Amino acid sequence: MDINDVKNICVVGAGNMGHQIATLCAIHGFKTTCTDISEEMLKKAEAFVDKYLPGRVEKGKLTAEQAEQARKNIRFTSSLEDAAKEADYVIEAAIEVLDIKRKVFADLDKFAPPHAILATNSSAIVSSRIADATQRPEKVLNLHF
């Protein structure tokens, strides 16, 4: 897969890192789905986006059209399966607990298309400790923001 083939991004985890990563992806033109098991976190993440984008317009960092398109590019769901089903690239930003990350990656392996790259945003857990939870260890990597 070539970088130009990446159109759809799934961000797992709607906390501080996750929702900001998802927002950045949406601003840069990717169809982005942010997912979390917590409806409360998803609501907070969506509220952040709805406040952040107009704020960037006010500061002259984005045009109104860019902000509008970014908002159209991002959606939120509590369903990991729904979030991952069309992903070309997945960025996991869940809690720094190895067992949880391994479970998330095992589920992503089932739900994401075979071509999808699965990245962890972890700064403490290397991808080699997660990769074997999938059937695609060669497509698992660390990507830290």
Please state what every model-predicted region is.
Residues 32, 74-76, 140:
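Generic structural signal for residues in well-ordered beta-strands
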Residues 102-145:
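Rossmann-fold NAD(P)-binding glycine/threonine-rich loop
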Residues 12, 20, 77, 93, ...:
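Structural motif
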Residues 56-111:
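A structured beta-alpha segment of the ubiquitous adenosine-cofactor-binding alpha/beta core
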Residues 3-8, 86-87, 115:
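Phosphate-coordination loops involved in phosphoryl transfer and adenosine-cofactor binding
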Residues 40, 82, 99, 125-126:
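Short alpha-helical
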Residues 1-55, 59:
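NAD(P)+-binding Rossmann beta1-loop-alpha1 motif at the extreme N-terminus of oxidoreductases
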